[in-house]
Amino acid sequence: MITGELKNKVDKIWEIFWTGGITNPLEVIEQFNYLLFIKQLDEVETRKERDANILGIPYEGIFPADCQQYRWSKFKNLGDANEIYDLMMNGVFPFIKNLHPDGESAYSKYMGDAIFKIPTPALLTKVIDGIDGLNLQGDSKGDLYEYLLSKLESAGKNGQFRTPRHIIQMMVELVKPVPSDIICDPAMGSAGFLICLLYTSD
């Protein structure tokens, strides 16, 4: 079960995303997971490097010599938000997307369409600081994911899912409403469907 401390930290990161402009719960979880993966990738690399050093055996790391700057422990301390953002957009994110470029592995298939959506350097650095403060050991990782999924479930119940505009437009075009139709949207949130219908009728 998730501890109160971890829950509070996750809630704070969620709020940072929300106030920073990412309000779709699915996108919050997606971007949260990408950054968490980047952090854990560096932690695994550090552990394997240490073990190889103790055992005196060679280790060919995940991060080549010319990609060391893509490690969480390196870029989180750059200090300049714009520099971190540029490195993430043009270096770190493309790097993790292409870790398995064969196109056959499950990783390649799931990461092939991954998009970095954090809109500003300020938001990215706040989220990095928040995630860096998460001390995830053992079962706490599973607890974290369960909690994120529970937030996704409650967001759906609270009507926090927004239907993308192009989907709304397609559905309205398929229905082909006429002025004499009576229209009801019982799951109305921001009234996207009704507004689109109004524009269509005009």
Predicted regions and their residues:
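Short glycine/serine/threonine-biased micro-segments
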Residues: 157, 187-190
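Glycine-rich SAM-binding Motif I of class I
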Residues: 191, 195
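Conserved small/polar residues in nucleotide/adenosyl-binding loops
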Residues: 199-202
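Conserved class I S-adenosyl-L-methionine
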Residues: 180-187
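Non-catalytic, mostly N-terminal accessory regions of nucleic-acid modification and defense proteins
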Residues: 1-179
